């Protein structure tokens, strides 16, 4: 029969998850190892996290010490689970929708996958990507640090007032 990506995702136990963050926070940190990450401002007062095609029990969303923490790194993974033979599984995507505020710090770390930051305002912005494209659109801040090992870097309407540090390998 024809290839069915949805059934393949089910066989790999991939799930879609949705979180609504009700606790207040002034900074955020998102750590992922294999997903496309999109962080964008929204015109609502509610912060939401949507994760698609994620292995079960691999994403945790908490607020600790006024910081939103999103951890999308599997806790116990065997070395051979990082390799996929044959057809690749559907791409995981994490979308964080933030209320339109000025945040103290926005920190994104991703091993494999694209990082997109849209319409976000923060004092300190820190982005680290090992493999994937980094795209910033309509960003303002005091300081910005971007490390991108493999992949393209796109900056559109980015205004940093004090210091910008970009490392592109």
Label each region the model flagged:
Residues 1-31, 36-110, 116-128, 135-148, ...:
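Acidic (Asp/Glu) and glycine-rich low-complexity loops/linkers
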Residues 168-169:
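Long, intrinsically disordered low-complexity tandem-repeat regions enriched in serine/threonine/proline
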């Amino acid at each position: 029969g024809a290839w069915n990506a949805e059934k393949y995702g089910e066989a790999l136990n991939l799930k879609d998850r949705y979180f609504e963050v009700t606790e207040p926070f002034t900074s955020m940190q998102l750590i992922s190892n294999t997903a496309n990450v999109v962080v964008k401002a929204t015109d609502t007062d509610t912060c939401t996290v949507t994760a698609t095609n994620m292995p079960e029990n691999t994403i945790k969303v908490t607020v600790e010490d006024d910081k939103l923490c999103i951890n999308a790194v599997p806790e116990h993974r065997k070395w051979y689970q990082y390799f996929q033979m044959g057809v690749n599984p559907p791409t995981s995507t994490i979308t964080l929708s933030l209320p339109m505020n000025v945040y103290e710090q926005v920190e994104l770390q991703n091993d494999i996958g694209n990082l997109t930051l849209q319409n976000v305002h923060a004092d300190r912005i820190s982005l680290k990507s090992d493999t994937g494209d980094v795209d910033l659109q309509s960003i303002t801040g005091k300081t910005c640090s971007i490390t991108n090992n493999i992949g393209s870097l796109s900056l559109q309407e980015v205004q940093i007032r004090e210091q910008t540090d970009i490392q592109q390998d």
